[in-house]
UniProtKB/Swiss-Prot annotation:
One GO process term, biological-process aspect: tRNA modification
Top enzyme class: oxidoreductase
GO cellular component, as recorded: cytoplasm
Native source organism of the sequence: Delftia acidovorans (strain DSM 14801 / SPH-1)
Protein known as: NADPH-dependent 7-cyano-7-deazaguanine reductase
Binding site for NADPH: S84, K85, R257, G258
Cytoplasm found in the keyword field: yes
Length: 282
């Protein structure tokens, strides 16, 4: 089983510019899920990790460089996630590789990533890969997460490691439906300790969640070392168990690093995924 410490994170890496799917480094989701009480395949949430790649390039058959953006949709049911530096190195391996067209690039991306994401599992599946060519760059929008801004609150913050005890909900009053947003989410890379900056949107129905406590809780991730996907699942599970909403979704959009941004979405009820639209900070 791969571990984060075995990855290329924090290490000097050779940049390979010929197609090399072996660069992908999958990490099992299970160990971190067990920490938050999620065991086996019976998960209390649905969702996906929405990735955007801003630095994809390859050569056409005449050697002329091609560039594109890519949106990836990785189901949260995959037993593995992809360590982000290995994802970057893998994408760089297309740089001097001659390929017929974007469709061939898309097919290789889908095949290679699906193999790594389901590696070691009897279950196999696919992922979403959408290549955005130059002719559609002007259709890529910038849009902020909608919802009531928690950051307006003047709260004292003293805890900088996850503190779920800050979460409270009023079960004595009628249930509500709310969408709350904060741009103050910060955590650190699990291996390198480098800062990860994000915005988070929380939609729920149920007993009204105390907003000051929720903001303080989100701020408490500030010195916490964990990957993006793991932070969002921890936030989901803490709210789900402490506040006991009827429905809940947690969606975070993290600023890009190495030409990639990662935007995990987890929800208690199956439904449509949010649009993968970047925010101003991304």
């Amino acid at each position: 089983m791969n571990t984060p410490e075995q990855s290329q994170l924090g290490k000097s890496s050779a940049y390979i510019d010929q197609y090399a799917p072996s660069l992908l480094f999958p990490l099992p989701r299970a160990p971190k899920r067990e920490e938050i009480g999620v065991q086996g395949s019976q998960m209390p949430f649905f969702g996906a990790d929405l990735w955007t790649a801003f630095e994809l390039s390859w050569l056409n058959l005449r050697g002329k460089p091609q560039v594109a953006l890519v949106h990836f949709t990785i189901p949260c049911e995959t037993p593995n996630l992809i360590e982000s530096k290995s994802f970057k190195l893998y994408l760089n391996s297309f740089n001097n590789t001659r390929l017929a067209d974007a469709a061939e690039v898309q097919a290789r991306l889908r095949t290679d990533l699906a193999e790594a994401l389901w590696r070691g599992s009897e279950q196999k599946g696919s992922i979403g890969v959408k290549i955005i060519g130059l002719d559609r760059f002007d259709q890529e929008m910038v849009q902020e997460l909608d919802g009531l801004l928690l950051d307006r609150l003047d709260v004292e913050c003293t805890q900088y490691q996850p503190a779920p005890e800050l979460l409270h909900a009023n079960h004595e009053e009628a249930p509500v439906t709310e969408t709350l947003v904060s741009h103050l989410l910060k955590s650190n890379c699990l291996v390198t300790g480098q800062p990860d900056w994000g915005s988070v949107q929380i939609r729920y129905s149920g007993a009204q969640i105390d907003q000051e406590g929720l903001l303080q809780y989100l701020v408490s991730f500030r010195n916490h070392n964990e990957f993006h996907e793991q932070c969002v699942e921890r936030i989901f599970m803490d709210i789900w168990t402490r506040c006991r909403p009827l429905k809940l979704s947690v969606y975070a959009r993290y600023t890009r690093r190495g030409g990639l941004d990662i935007n995990p979405f987890r929800t208690s009820h199956p439904g449509a995924l949010p649009a993968n639209v970047r925010s101003a900070r991304q």
